Amino acid sequence: MQTTIRGELVEPYAEALLSLAQSHNLADQFQQDSGLILDLLAASAELQEFLANPLINPDAKKNVLRQLTVDKVHGYFLNFLMLLVDRRRINLLAAICQQYRALLRKLRNIVLAEVISAVELTEQQRHAVVEKVKTMTGAADVELAIAIDPELLGGVVIKVGSQIFDASLRGQLRRLSVSLAQPV
């Protein structure tokens, strides 16, 4: 139930941010700005706790956000952050930024492909993954989110929405062990 309520709060703010971005031709700028915010939040658990703490004065939160984003985000985006503080919704900031990016991808017919690889992918391998995902989904473009997991032993696992394409050595070994365990 908490997730549903949170989703109902996040969606309107993300849609409002997208509407603002489109009306001022700032969709790409806001995508960069939201990426910066997501990076800041991911890098600092203290910042997350600070912004989520209802006992901390809203002006203190605004000052910290201004200091962190001065000359790094567009003024309209900064105003949006201040609005979230005023409305006591700043604790939803990461979810709103993620939803904004998802709405923008949907609008532009871009899919997000989460790629897990045993080693760092070369540019040629990245291109091959993008083309494979385009073929699988019919999307105009693909945004890659790449993670490294040495336990895969080799190959990649690609997740697009609810679809998973497992071309890893670990996955092949698992499928082989399952088939060998089947009675003849």
Swiss-Prot record:
Pfam families: OSCP (PF00213). Keywords: ATP synthesis, CF(1), Hydrogen ion transport, Ion transport, Membrane, Thylakoid, Transport. One of its GO terms (molecular function) is proton-transporting ATP synthase activity, rotational mechanism. It is found in: Cellular thylakoid membrane. One of its GO terms (cellular component) is proton-transporting ATP synthase complex. InterPro entries: ATP_synth_OSCP/delta_N_sf, ATPase_OSCP/d_CS, ATPase_OSCP/dsu. It is a peripheral membrane protein. Gene3D superfamilies: N-terminal domain of the delta subunit of the F1F0-ATP synthase (1.10.520.20). Its main location: membrane. The keyword Ion transport applies. Belongs to the ATPase delta chain family. F(1)F(0) ATP synthase produces ATP from ADP in the presence of a proton or sodium gradient. F-type ATPases consist of two structural domains, F(1) containing the extramembraneous catalytic core and F(0) containing the membrane proton channel, linked together by a central stalk and a peripheral stalk. During catalysis, ATP synthesis in the catalytic domain of F(1) is coupled via a rotary mechanism of the central stalk subunits to proton translocation. F-type ATPases have 2 components, F(1) - the catalytic core - and F(0) - the membrane proton channel. F(1) has five subunits: alpha(3), beta(3), gamma(1), delta(1), epsilon(1). CF(0) has four main subunits: a(1), b(1), b'(1) and c(10-14). The alpha and beta chains form an alternating ring which encloses part of the gamma chain. F(1) is attached to F(0) by a central stalk formed by the gamma and epsilon chains, while a peripheral stalk is formed by the delta, b and b' chains. This is ATP synthase subunit delta.
